[in-house]
């Protein structure tokens, strides 16, 4: 809904003080919002490098910065999108969104269906993005523990409405609320 691919039933989407509710997705992207779809949506018949540059905009995120962050993509830059593993495709989808140099990055289920080693690699990337690039990230993720570890604030939605809002660290330690909201039992830590 924030990106404009799902119709809103009520409410408004504001970004940087501007009502984006009625803008097409491409206009929202031009306003500084990057989006990584759950389905990845890379271009299978383009090379990695072509995927990265097809919608790129000038800024800190250029090919050199992307290849430094995603060494696997540098190694595979001449491969076609459909020749990449699922994890590499997800890296490419995130990297392509970064090449638009967004101020806000929306990540929809970025860890879904990926091998644990790839999930760990992407967690490191997201952590670096949050620490070094001054980029805001909205993370939609069903792996609650991972999401809470990565984020500062947590918002639990139920049918599109806010069911609960708290600091992520606070919610991580509130096992009763977690179990009530998402059915998650967090192992006690010593």
Predicted regions and their residues:
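Glycine-rich phosphate-binding loops of nucleotide-dependent enzymes
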Residues: 1-190
